């Protein structure tokens, strides 16, 4: 049994770490092959494809010219804007954080309104999250949270609305209660058993959202973050229905394609019917196998990470390290940092080149499907944190070149990395953020 990234991030590693001993091998290029470094989490598939030489790339119409804003500079805030709003937290002062966001050139924040927990009809309901016991968790909660989370969200959105340059996307991470022994989370309003039920839960929240705030500043709604990994029990249901796991094949089977399209498109259809004024999507990894799935999305949010390239994971030992008490220990930080620096020095141009090919393929797919392309978290390692043992230089270099790549492939939305939150040291360098954001906004 492999432990999914959704499980680890949603409710932590407590109670789940025993499964790491039998991780799933990373899927490499071409036919399935063994790896000396088993991955305890789903990794992006690194398989190659025959390039799509469709005429769509020659289209003179640029969808972004008819969208508002014309470019999105995106900051991924997940649940941290609520979970770190406690006294002493990095989001304690919403006015200060929002002003700093504008100062750094961001115009779109990506937030999880937690529809499984939050009832905006009863916003003063006290919600309690136990201490996650994860001292090396970069996002979300880093200590116990107690308070009227619904009121905090209302306060946050009302203050965001006072800043005319700011927009937001809503994104569902669908954190759930963990196995026995996991830190306690609030009582669920409802647990979805399929994507359609997830859409119904979203519809309840969005109805209340419209009454309180309207929809003017919502860019789009990401119904489920990084399908299929974060939506409750989806991976297990897909395997049961199709006889094969999502990460088991280098190309999706016909049964898998049918299952994914049916689940996702029906949920999107329900929400489009009830809220025709909103855009809906589900975010995905930069996994080229998605190009075979006929999804009907209004926007396409793709997350491109280095673990899609075995040349990076083999050199850095990333898949091994994240299987060693992720969020709970720093004992492998120094080696991971040193390996990452050496890898960047040796093959950064090669890694960038392959990542650009993936961007080109998704850009073409987005054009053919009629969807603007964004990335709200991406590029190098999806796990890093401020620590004396971890050097950020190589990661920030990757972020710098990513803006030119996003411009080349006509991305609507871009982010430099998935650490654009006020608790990170990089946040204090306002000029660094502003320079990159201005470059993208003026492209």
Predicted regions and their residues:
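Aromatic-lined carbohydrate-recognition surfaces of secreted/lumenal glycan-active proteins
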Residues: 220-225, 261-289, 372-376, 416
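Active-site groove signature of glycoside hydrolases
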Residues: 170-179, 203-254
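Glycoside hydrolase catalytic-domain groove-lining segments
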Residues: 254, 258, 285-383
């Amino acid at each position: 049994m492999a432990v999914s990234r959704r499980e680890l991030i949603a409710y932590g590693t407590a109670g789940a770490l025993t499964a790491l001993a039998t991780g799933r091998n990373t899927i490499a290029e071409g036919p399935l092959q063994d790896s000396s470094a088993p991955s305890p989490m789903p990794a992006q598939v690194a398989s190659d494809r025959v390039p799509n030489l469709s005429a769509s790339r020659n289209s003179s119409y640029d969808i972004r010219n008819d969208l508002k804003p014309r470019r999105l500079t995106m900051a991924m805030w997940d649940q941290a804007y609520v979970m770190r709003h406690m006294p002493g937290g990095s989001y304690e002062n919403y006015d200060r954080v929002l002003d700093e966001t504008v100062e750094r050139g961001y115009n779109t924040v990506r937030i999880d309104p937690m529809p499984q927990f939050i009832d905006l009809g009863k916003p003063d309901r006290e919600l309690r999250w136990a201490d996650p016991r994860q001292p090396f968790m970069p996002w979300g909660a880093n200590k116990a949270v107690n308070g009227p989370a619904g009121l905090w969200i209302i306060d946050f959105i009302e203050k965001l609305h006072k800043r005319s340059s700011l927009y937001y996307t809503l994104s569902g991470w669908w954190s759930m209660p963990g196995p026995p022994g996991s830190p306690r989370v609030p009582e669920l309003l409802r647990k979805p058993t399929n994507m359609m039920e997830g859409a119904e839960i979203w519809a309840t929240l969005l109805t209340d959202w419209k009454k309180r705030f309207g929809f003017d500043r919502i860019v789009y709604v990401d119904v489920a973050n990084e399908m299929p990994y974060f939506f409750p029990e989806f991976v297990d249901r897909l395997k049961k229905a199709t006889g094969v796991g999502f990460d088991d094949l280098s190309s999706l089977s016909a049964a898998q394609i049918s299952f994914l399209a049916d689940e996702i498109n029906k949920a999107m259809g329900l929400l489009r019917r009830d809220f025709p004024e909103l855009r809906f999507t589900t975010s995905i990894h930069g996994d080229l196998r998605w190009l075979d799935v006929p999804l009907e999305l209004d926007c396409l949010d793709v997350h491109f990470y280095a673990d899609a390239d075995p040349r990076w994971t083999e050199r850095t030992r990333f898949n091994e390290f994240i299987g060693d008490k992720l969020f709970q220990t720093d004992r492998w930080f120094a080696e991971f940092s040193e390996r990452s620096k050496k890898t960047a020095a040796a093959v950064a141009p090669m890694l960038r080149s392959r990542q650009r090919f993936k961007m080109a393929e998704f850009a073409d797919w987005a054009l053919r499907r009629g969807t603007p392309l964004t990335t709200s978290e991406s590029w190098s390692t999806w796990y890093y944190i401020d620590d004396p043992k971890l050097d950020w230089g190589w990661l920030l270099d990757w972020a710098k070149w990513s803006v030119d790549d996003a411009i080349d492939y006509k991305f609507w939305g871009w982010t430099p990395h998935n650490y654009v939150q006020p608790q990170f040291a990089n946040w204090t360098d306002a000029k660094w953020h502003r320079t990159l954001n201005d470059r993208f906004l003026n492209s």
